[in-house]
Amino acid sequence: MFNLLFSSSNQRRINSYAATVKKINSLEQKIGNLSDEELFTKTSYFKDELKKGVTLDYILPEAFSVVREAGCRVLGLRVFDVQIIGAIILHQGKIAEMKTGEGKTLVATLAGYLNALSGKGVHIVTVNDYLARRDSEWVGQIHKFLGLSVGLIQQDLSKAERKLAYQCDVTYVTNSELGFDYLKDNMVLSMSEIVQNKFAFCIIDEVDSILIDEARTPLIISGPSEAPVEKYTQTNLLSNILFKDVHYEVDEKARNIILTDKGTLFCEDHLSIDNLYDLENPWVHYILNAIKAKELFIKDVHYIIRDNQVVIVDEFTGRIMSGRRWSDGLHQAIEAKEQVPIQQENQTYASITYQNFFLLYPKLSGMTGTAKTEESELDKIYNLEVICVPTHRPLRRKEFSDLVYSNEYRKWEAIADECYDMYRAGRPTLVGTTSVEKSELLSKLLTEYKIPHSLLNAKPENVEKESDIIAQAGRQSSVTIATNMAGRGTDIILGGNPSYIAKSILIDLLIKKISVQNNLKLQQLSLKTQYCINQILKSLEDDLIYANLSVLELEKKISIACEQVAISRNLEIQLRKAYQLIFQEYENIFSQEKKYVAQAGGLHVIGTERHESRRIDNQLRGRAGRQGDPGSSRFFLSIEDNLLRIFGGNKIADLMQALNVDDDTPMESTLLSKSLEAAQKKVEAYFYDTRKQVFEYDQVLNSQRQAIYAERRRILESGYPRDCILQYAESTIDDIVNFCLTSKENNEKFVNLNTKIKYLLNATDTFFISKDLYSDSSELKKWITEQVRINYDLREAYLEQIKPGLIRQLEKYYLLQQIDNAWKDHLQKMGALRDAIGWRSYGQQDPLVEYKNEAFNLFIEMITHVKHTVVYAILRSRLMVKND
């Protein structure tokens, strides 16, 4: 009944868009009759209408119709009705759930164009540089055709290039580049260094990956700290003589370690110290990380060793995360465990979670194939509603019920048997595994079965072949083993992907220098095509641009030639000719193979373990049955799998025992399916609570961050920072006077105050505050403030003689330097507070409430410190003038 109500609620939403879609369709002929120039002028017409007070919603039907027509003319692609619905959802600041292959990239152009008309800029966020560049060069042509500017942010861009890209109407950028640019903008020393404009509207592709999977991982800008490397080596050795359930307990659900009293005493005795928790010489942090590295972080599952370094493997995608490091000393603990060089621990200069970063946008939306299972979290944290968009063609994928085995060995045998059956039937098979270790185990098993297969995991030798392997995973009898990395990015096309194979042939010919005669892929093509390719290659030999290209530049030229982007240079034109010749022949070859594969049942997806989130499982299933193709999926499980063992294995094991199921017989029942779903919901709820807790704690820091960044911006924008300095001075004087006047001895009051003010003003020994002023503290403060102003005026006049405007530069420098230094130290203190606050729960205190209270006190201390330090630095600084 609930599902019925739920479905009808979503359907009512979809039905509510019908009138708008109908209106857009009614304009199609009228807009189609416009010339290119008339279509182009529509953009300026829409902008004028908005200036008159017309709303975006009012012009939406005509604007969407204009974009649809531009897409037909520029790319030869017509936007379907369901894609229009998806675009309306994005414009409304919601999440559009659209299945694999439904054309999400094109959907973003409609909402992006409409919102860019306001002149505030639109950010379209992708998960990697390649997708950002591809989308900007491909669908970005639609925006350019209609007169909008298109920007692209890539990792290697300079500040000036970034600034220009962010000033464009539509900017394509990755989530990490966008976040880091925000943090860097709040560390600059002049307004001219800021690259981003004010945030307005953001469309996030693969929104669940960024807002949920990445939610627990903050963006951090850091620098070297002074943490001693020896402590990691010592605690690694110590962890090896500590025993589980004796010296420490492991909480697998929370992925956390708890030292027992016996363990604490043992460690203190072994290290010859009195207190593990001593703030002046803390050891507990290092010990807990060493035990985490030993118990919870497994080689070839959570990380790999490459070039004598620990490289993180993303638990959601299976991809290696080069350049990323675990924070808070955990990475160093794993380096000590693996006996590779231990790199210096870093200190955080600036940080923000994706949760709080994307909430900075007044209007936020996103697209993904899998979000409905997480709609509660997306709504509660981001205020984002999820709406499922119908597929353009009916979904034909068969989803078989799970098979559960009593032990893992029998499960893997059954998976190998299934692969063999599919291989014999001519059906392509994609097997999703959860780790490098499991993927290699299955690969060995399939080798024993003599089943040809491709292996794709985080190992460097396999990562390089990722696109090729996935692009051809839909071919007849192909078997592909992949970690979760296969879930996104490249479509699996039944029969094979002619676009990818054509591109790979060009790379073989031009970069790897494999001749036409020795290229096995080319040998499958007609002699006429081989001859034409040879002629094109010969013509390139005389091209000076081609001759001077580096490998990376040539690879980029090939990518451009292989995509549907406008080109004009001879080199790119010749490369595209070669690409199209190869593509057309392979398209004919693969179309025949596609018919056979479709008749055999299409792509079969095998899941080897349930993930902690149903959403990740759905991503794997979604590889089959794209765009109305046939396909199927099935999960093979064992009660020894991590998810079932930790979150529900006993109940399921008892059920199997009650039904007297032997080791070789899989269990398949409605009751079992419900138990599996309950286990998965339990783990989803657990991790949601974890992310919610991260969010709640980071909200405390976020409010402080916004206050500091607002103060920084006020100083940067100020042409007269003197006012800020004098405000700080008044506050400092208040603090000094209030502190000194609380002294019990009158004589002591006078001496203390006189000494402190004399020091503040950098005055001579003759400086003296009249005792008559002490009777009225407000008059006393006014008098001291006036002395500070006089002192400041004299200092300003002196510096103006040396160099006009020098005092203003010094003011900004001192203000920003002290704020940045204090914020950096504050982040370290907040991190230490966050680590320690959990213990308060043992004293019947709410850790979050305690954290808020102590964080507030730390923040007030920091603000006070900044004000005092700036005022003392300005009033006591001595400028050395160098004579030429």
Swiss-Prot record:
GO terms for molecular function: ATP binding; protein-exporting ATPase activity. PROSITE patterns: SECA (PS01312), SECA_MOTOR_DEAD (PS51196). It is a peripheral membrane protein. CDD domains: DEXDc_SecA (cd17928), SF2_C_secA (cd18803). InterPro entries: Helicase_ATP-bd, P-loop_NTPase, SecA, SecA_CS, SecA_DEAD, SecA_motor_DEAD, SecA_preprotein_X-link_dom, SecA_SF2_C. Gene3D superfamilies: Helical scaffold and wing domains of SecA, P-loop containing nucleotide triphosphate hydrolases, SecA, preprotein cross-linking domain. It holds the Pfam family P-loop_SecA. Its EC number is 7.4.2.8. Has a central role in coupling the hydrolysis of ATP to the transfer of proteins across the thylakoid membrane. Belongs to the SecA family. This is Protein translocase subunit SecA.
